[in-house]
Amino acid sequence: MSLSPSPVIDEAALQRLRDLDPGGKNHLLERVLRAFETSVVRLGAQLVDARAKNDMQSVRHAVHTLKSSSASIGAMRLSRLCAEIEAAVRVEAFAGLPPLLDDVDRELVVVLQALLPLRDAPP
């Protein structure tokens, strides 16, 4: 059985993960989603700390990692926001970062909430 995913999470990405574990015997999707949740907590804290210290290279590192991991689980808006921040930091366009970082903070909450029913759903 498959729950209808939230529009926050791309179904095709989830299906690619499911396809790697036919029948769900290895609980791959659940494990990947739990690992994502754990990394989000760590990366979110790093992002808050880097932002408070105005450490743009640490911001860039955190969003780079978050960009890839969020894309892998289908959180495409979050991934795009992270890519936008990463590109801005790369060219030192810092003026527009505060609202983008706020968007990432909000989207992290939305993504984590969307993952809860997916993480515990049967394969």
Segments from the language model and where they lie:
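Two-component system phosphorelay core
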Residues: 1-123
